[in-house]
């Protein structure tokens, strides 16, 4: 049974890769309504895959209702927006929508982020490209805590849904890291790692 579940997961990952490749090969659309339809279609594909993955799908997809709430609270009209574990880029997409819906200028916000999963990182790049958003997600997929691609960044807005309850997140390699201003996070409290990282920015 376990082998069958692994086989199904592998097939699902291949399907996800096919979806990403499909959108990668689509010529970018400049017109607003058509571009919005393409973006919504891509977002729908991501949500369906996340739903099928269940708990594991949360590593790249945060429910849109949660993202909208975060953005409405922060109101990122202008400045640098950062997500250290950006997944498929939902935080960035919603930030851009917020600016547009309030008659703001999308060029007034700068997008920064990264993700450790190469497929997810590619998904984020495409999710943003479809909507005409030019982000800085680093030149390759990388773990924020072990390989920070934006070490000098000082963000104005930080939104994140970081991975929790990781048993091994590389603490032994980061004991002297400058981000631990308030103390080294215990191995069993991985959420503190994310909190201290955002406070450092």
Task: Please place each PLM-identified region on the residue numbering.
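Non-catalytic, mostly N-terminal accessory regions of nucleic-acid modification and defense proteins
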Residues: 1-5, 9-77, 136-149
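A short, gly/pro- and small-residue-rich
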Residues: 175-185
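Alpha-helix N-cap/helix-start and coil->helix boundary motif
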Residues: 38-39, 89, 118, 198
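Conserved S-adenosyl-L-methionine
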Residues: 56-160, 165-176
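N-terminal functional modules and adjacent low-complexity/disordered segments of proteins
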Residues: 11, 44, 118, 177-179
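Short, small-residue-biased leader/transition segments that mark boundaries at the very start
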Residues: 3-8, 194-197, 201
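Conserved Class I SAM-dependent methyltransferase catalytic core
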Residues: 188-193
């Amino acid at each position: 049974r376990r082998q069958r579940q692994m086989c199904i997961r592998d097939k699902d990952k291949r399907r996800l890769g096919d979806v990403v490749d499909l959108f990668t090969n689509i010529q970018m659309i400049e017109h607003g309504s058509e571009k919005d339809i393409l973006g919504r279609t891509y977002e729908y594909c991501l949500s369906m895959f996340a739903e099928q993955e269940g708990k594991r799908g949360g590593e790249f997809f945060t429910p849109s209702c949660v993202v909208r709430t975060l953005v409405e609270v922060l109101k990122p009209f202008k400045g640098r927006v950062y997500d250290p574990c950006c997944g498929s880029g939902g935080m960035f997409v919603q930030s851009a929508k917020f600016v547009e819906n309030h008659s703001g200028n999308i060029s007034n916000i700068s997008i920064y982020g990264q993700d450790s999963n190469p497929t997810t990182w590619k998904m984020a790049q495409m999710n943003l490209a479809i909507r005409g958003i030019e982000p800085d997600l680093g030149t390759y997929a990388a773990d924020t805590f072990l390989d920070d691609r934006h070490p000098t960044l000082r963000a104005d807005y930080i939104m994140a849904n970081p991975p929790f309850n990781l048993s091994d997140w590389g603490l032994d390699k980061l004991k002297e890291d400058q981000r631990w201003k308030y103390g080294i996070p215990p191995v069993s409290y991985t959420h503190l790692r994310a909190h201290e990282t955002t406070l450092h920015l």
